[in-house]
């Protein structure tokens, strides 16, 4: 899901792309092979640091969007035939990825407000030899909930207890409407058990297809997997993002984007209330793109 493309700073990004195209050298392609452009990885690491999360640029692998980050993360910690837990309902792309990699999906009940049922999750962990969980902890697609900090702490502790890797799909974390950006579950990861995946696609520029994974001890393996599949992420797009982020316009753009999305989401909710039958229940939340109807 993407918002109105007019909400993105496409003119500024095109200027950055034109600028780097003039100055790119033959070495640019080599310098941007996995794990990706070092300046871009440093910029992403600084974004983590703003939330008090220490991530080394060496732990970050730049990918062709978040979906590649998620797929590579799955490949790094599973083998065909392994069990992977997903939410019910979950992002359809997760199920497609599991099928393609010949992994078994194990769905766990998920509440519209509270998120994944941790008791049901523990029962699943006790009954099945689960290798990984693919979960969205912030602005979940499609329900829209964000897990509380307390629940994220419990989630990370539970998965660590059973030695199960959390693949955290966090592509909507910048699209919060409150005062503070919600922390990812990665913030409470003390045992290198969370692979945190995100991208610029949902909040800045869908067409560039630039994502990443904070991969920790799995970074080298993910680099090798990427070299064997897509080889690398687009060098011009990486360089253009580095140029744009250096202008310090990103946070101003995010503030405008969040304000406009909140207004549009409110208008959509009001229109649905007005035109749909009374028996239709519309769940509204304070982040992301999604409204859930029952």
Task: Please place each PLM-identified region on the residue numbering.
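Inter-domain helical "communication" segments and dimerization helices
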Residues: 22-27, 246-251, 272-281
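Short beta-strand segments
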Residues: 86, 134-137, 167-170, 198, ...
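Conserved core of the PLP fold type I
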Residues: 17-162, 167, 173-192, 261
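Short histidine/acidic/glycine/proline-rich micro-motifs that form metal-
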Residues: 2-7, 111-112, 140-142, 172-175, ...
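Conserved N-terminal helix/loop that builds the PLP phosphate-binding region
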Residues: 1-24
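Conserved glycine-rich beta-strand-loop-beta hairpin in the small C-terminal domain of fold type I
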Residues: 259-269, 279-294
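Conserved core segment of the aminotransferase class I/II
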Residues: 13, 190-259
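Hydrophobic/aromatic residues within well-ordered alpha-helical segments
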Residues: 9, 20, 36, 40, ...
